[in-house]
Swiss-Prot record:
The lineage of its organism: Bacteria, Bacillati, Mycoplasmatota, Mycoplasmoidales, Metamycoplasmataceae. Residues 1-21 are annotated as: Disordered. Belongs to the bacterial ribosomal protein bL28 family. GO terms for cellular component: ribonucleoprotein complex; ribosome. This is Large ribosomal subunit protein bL28. Pfam families: Ribosomal_L28.
Length: 63
């Protein structure tokens, strides 16, 4: 299961955890994925989108 936004294609970002001694270990910043249903061509389609994309869809009255 890929952690990717179905509409925008955004995926996780990578960075570092930093301890008090400033040791760096790699980590992932995952998206806040939400399941939403959108009507496309008269059919209901379930998508996994980021919270930001879902907010934009709500603002444009698409969900």
């Amino acid at each position: 299961m890929s952690r990717r936004d179905d509409l925008t294609g955004k995926g996780p970002m990578f960075g570092n955890n930093r301890s008090h001694a400033l040791n760096a270990t790699r980590r992932r910043f995952n998206l806040n994925l939400q399941k939403v249903s959108v009507v496309v061509n008269g059919r209901k389609v379930n998508l996994k989108v980021s919270a930001k994309t879902a907010k934009t869809l709500r603002r444009k009255n698409l969900i």
